[in-house]
Amino acid sequence: MLTCQRKRESLSKGIAGKNATRSLAILGLFAAPWVGFLAVALKPSPRQMWSQRWPTITFVGLYQLALDRCVEIFGLEHLPRTGPVILAGNHINKTACDAMLMGSKILVERGSLAKFVSQPNPPDRMLKHFLRLMGNADGVILPIQKGLTTETMIKFLRNPEAFGRQQPILGIFPAGSADGDFEAQMNRPWHTGVAVAACESGAPVVPFYIEGLPYHWGPFDLLKAASRSLVGSRAFDFKIHLGPPIVPGPGQTNYAEVTERIRHGVLQLAG
């Protein structure tokens, strides 16, 4: 009983501390809006964030002020603190807002800026513009290039310094496109690129299962959700579940088998 009470008290103090920090940050914005916002955005990892383009800086700042309270992560202990890591799991949002939220949460919790593999030609004109801005070497997006994507993934995992990183964390959606139907996404063929990158680089694959974000939401929906979160309760409840790392054996070349192990890991997390 006493242990449970202490845990509850510790959790309450942690939440109170986060809320106090958030309130101070908001007050700072009133005093010096642009300087205050930039300070908030750069805080998780000043060196990495300073090299980012304005859409990334803006989103990370907004995330810390209003959206972090809408995102929960479970199993963070499974994410290695050093060395290359691949995150692989389900994809639930057609404009990759799930990747943006997941990357921001890991940045806030660990100080590492993840890079997510992305489709090269999104249908929306604004998203295409963002992709061009954030798809550079230091950016948070690794655009798919026919015949070159897996090679670039391996380079990122082996030589993070060339991409402005200390620890390379690569996010991949092996099913490809997003789908609101989890079962359908699990049953369709998965790309083996994640397995190839893991086997070639020696990086462990941490499976993830995400839930709680509408399929159709775009950046403007997140902006509206942020405004609601600033003045009231959480606008949505996005949950990230991380599983134990999957490590390919030495000399492993059966990429289909490794891919199935990853798929099974995601299914286990989904329950």
Predicted region positions:
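Soluble catalytic domains of membrane acyltransferases
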Residues: 64-256
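N-terminal membrane-anchoring alpha-helices
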Residues: 3-64
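Polar low-complexity intrinsically disordered regions enriched in Ser/Thr and small residues
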Residues: 17-20, 39, 78, 150, ...
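Short, cationic low-complexity segments
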Residues: 260-271
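Intrinsic low-complexity, intrinsically disordered segments enriched in polar/basic residues
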Residues: 6-8, 223, 271
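Generic structural signal for hydrophobic residues
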Residues: 58-59, 127, 194, 262
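Feature targets compositionally biased, intrinsically disordered low-complexity regions
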Residues: 13-16, 27, 35, 82, ...
